[in-house]
Amino acid sequence: VAALIVALMVVKVGGELAWQSLRELIDTGLDVEDLESIRRVILSISGVKALHLLRTRRVGEQALADVHIIVDDHLSVSEGHQISEMVRAKLIREIASLADVMVHIDTEEDVNVASCAGLPLRDELQKRLDNYFRDIPEARLIEHMTLHYLNGRIDIELLLPQDAVTHSTTARQLAQRFAAAVRNDRDIGNVDVHF
């Protein structure tokens, strides 16, 4: 009888160890309650408008998370990075099972909008703009250009010195000339000129 009891205990412990080992080998995510806790923590961070593509995976007793957060589309890269670091740190601090978190910054709900994947980067776009703006003398005065890749197009912000506006050319006329020059390029959305 004692041998039977010991044998049953060995089978029980062996089964539990086998089940735990099997769970560690199989990718499983966190349960619904943990996912809701993660969502609450993320949405409590200032600057986070929404989140999507939240994925988790258990690695032994700990878990890893991967999430896309949506921030304002005109934030600087460094501010977006700072927000992502705050999200990461707060999640690791407040969700005990999380060992690491990968936070991606998005400026729009990219699962529902046109992709920006095929749009040109700055170098290629700059060549196009040089050609488009060749008949606008004030284009040589551009001090800074900011590109916003949004909804499948590139919105452009140009910064010109105040003296680019002369008595014969108003700021509005100059802005209209820059916008008209790129009107036929399907990759370009809005052109905003600031002085």
Regions found by a protein language model. Give the residues of each.
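Alpha-helical transmembrane segments and adjacent TM-loop junctions that form the membrane-embedded core
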Residues: V1-F195
